[in-house]
Amino acid sequence: MATVASALRDEGFGATVTYSRKLFLPLTQLCRDVCHYCTFAKTPKKLGAAYMTVEQVLEQVREGERLGCKEALFTLGERPERRYRAAREALEQMGFTSTLEYLAHVAGRVLAETSVLPHINAGCMTDEEIALLRPVSASMGIMLETASDRLGEKGMPHYGSPDKVPARRLETIDRAGAAAVPFTSGILIGIGETRRERVESLLALRQLQQRHGHLQEIIIQNFRAKPGTQMAESPEPDLQELVWTIAIARLIFGARMSLQAPPNLSPGVLPQLIAAGINDWGGVSPMTPDYVNPEAPWPEVERLTRETAQCGKFLHQRLTVYPRYVRDSATWLAPEVRSRVLAHCDGEGMPREDSWLTGSGRGLPNRDREWLERAGQLSAPLNISPAIATVLDRASSVQGANELSVADIEVLFSARNDDFAAVCRAADQLRQQRCGETVSYVVNRNINYTNVCYFKCQFCAFSKGKLSENLRGRPYDLSAEEISRRACEAWERGASELCLQGGIHPEYTGQTYLDIVHTLRRATPGAHIHAFSPLEVWQGAQTLGVTLAEFLQRLKAAGLDSMPGTAAEILDDTVRAELCPDKINTAQWLEVMEASHRVGLRTTATIMFGHIDNYQSWARHLVSIRDLQRRTGGFTEFVPLPFVASESPIYLKGRARRGPTLREALLMHAVARLVFHGTIDNIQASWVKMGVEGVQACLHAGANDVGGTLMNETITRAAGAQHGQEMSPQAFEQLITAAGRRARPRNTLYGDADPAQLRRARQARPLQPPENTPASRYEREKLVTDIIATA
């Protein structure tokens, strides 16, 4: 049975075993129940104070925060004020009428003043009490222990404990499900129950799970006899009983339920517990004891990591709220909690493990740097999980890469530890095979002609309306003369490419975009005009009442040479519905790209990731790009654009993550290299998003291009990035050489750069201050005829 259970666990969780780094807060050890095995509950005479003070709690939580704890486990006796005068008087003195009211206050302070997330074990609760605690906790729990009324009869362990009546506990679990609370429950074995009663208890929990879907984990806890209790001499369940119960629980709940056994209660036999089907060790504290089982100290995380690895599994930290609930946080978390959880997690719903942020200028975390170095050591053996090994083997051929499914690609994005190193190694080897040791860059200039936009993209800190001047400056709409001046200046400074995009000004039409191209072509006849996202093209065609193909032909005739594949964000309409609901949808974006390719306009392809998306949406995006490229061959490169959060409206509203982790950012480049094997050879790393060190890391994870010098970069800086507005050719070449590669200046379409322009770029004078013409009610003229061409 354990063999089947273990296989089920592997189906659901692969090689990952999780734990939560927590601190244990016994808010009160007074309790009205008298469980015969319990040493947690104390009488007032044995306690210095009825309750921990807020200051004591915060002091411990801040120490736990310093030690890397992400969970504050509040455990307390049930309704002590109904039994003890000391509890009632203490609550009255603090200004509270009940223990749970005080608990809500304390947990709220922890949530507001620290980065640690409260998990609350408050016992049996009413609907009103659950509603009181939901806004101050990421998750809650109550051990069912048993569904057998027999264990509450005289002489049995729950006799005299009104809160241990199974119906009351099941009612609380049911209420929590109705309130959409991520919830923990489980059973306690070895307290006099039969195997049949264990199964009946697990089936009762499964019934509630089928009704609400809120049980994030099931704990199988083995009884430990404790001196000084009525059950001090009772026999403890042996290992065979524990293994049997874990295995039967896995069979009852299936592959996807997280199944936990506390490691401190079974020292020396952890491999047997893994073999029985668990995938989680529960909370492990680096600082506080297990107050419920004080005789059983927590194992050190380092030792737990080693013992887990000996079973062929990777130990990984999780939050108190499990990944699948984080990924649907709008449903499962109160708004007050959701923002705190999203700030802590990655795209899988696991905790961020370092302080690196896109665009922040912070150095690379040692952990990821070490894994990347390990990937580059080809002789270093890697312990690769079977799922990753299978997908990497398929991706090694063009045909196999073209057949990778969304599920296959999700597996690659979930890679951690040795799996992460293996994916980066495979991508780097493929990069070497397809592109050699050169890294290319282009001398170009960004010209963002307006930051006025009538679209309401939730991530955008660049576009300006009348309410956003206090964030990033005043709305502007460049005149034709300023556009022309910037283009001429760019050419004189060695640029071969002019890259133009902007907001969708409500007064702009397709003629506006045609006028911009005419102005640029008159000013700089020799420059490559790389302009207009699919959104601008779609809007331009609509306003002129012509087809996409006709409008694109007009743009091309006016002098447009190629197009950026921006406005893609995430090509998954479930994400776009919240991220950019009024923007073109996935099918429309792909339609513009295909039409562009059909009229002979090459384009880039992009992804903007790390906000409200997940690995499935990333995979869908890559598949959409790959499949279109197989039809048209029109994409020149793929450009991952990690989300910069700090000034983004959706992040400031608490509805998005803080951008991808470094692991995720590197994997996006690596996985793209593998998925686009034989279809898109150029994978570009964005220096304005990743920074110099980040770009160099990407060059060892599948990237072969570092983009453009830019001269003026405003969109990413508006979102809060700190990496500057221009990267000179000399700086690019220093960056590339330091990464052990050879620099190759290029043009937009990946041919060699013009030597004359490159000489100009190396001797470029400082930029003149740009003039951002203030926006007025109507658009400014974009066509001028009295221009003296510079090239």
Where are these regions (language model features)?
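N-terminal [4Fe-4S]-dependent radical SAM core
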Residues: M1-H36, F40-Y51, E55-Q56, Q60, ...
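Auxiliary Fe-S-binding modules of radical SAM enzymes
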Residues: M1-T3, D10-G12, L58, E65, ...
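Conserved, mostly hydrophobic/aromatic
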Residues: A5, C35, F74, I142, ...
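Mobile, glycine- and charge-enriched loop segments
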Residues: R9, V17, R21, C31-R32, ...
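Hydrophobic faces of well-ordered beta-strands that scaffold small-molecule active sites
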Residues: Y19-L23, A72-F74, P118-I120, M140-I142, ...
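Conserved short loop/turn motifs at secondary-structure junctions
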Residues: R21-P26, P118-A122, I189-G192, Q260-P263, ...
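Short, small-residue-rich loop/turn micro-motifs
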Residues: Q29-C31, T39, L76-E78, L144-S148, ...
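Conserved Radical SAM active-site core
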Residues: P44-Q210, R394, K464-D627
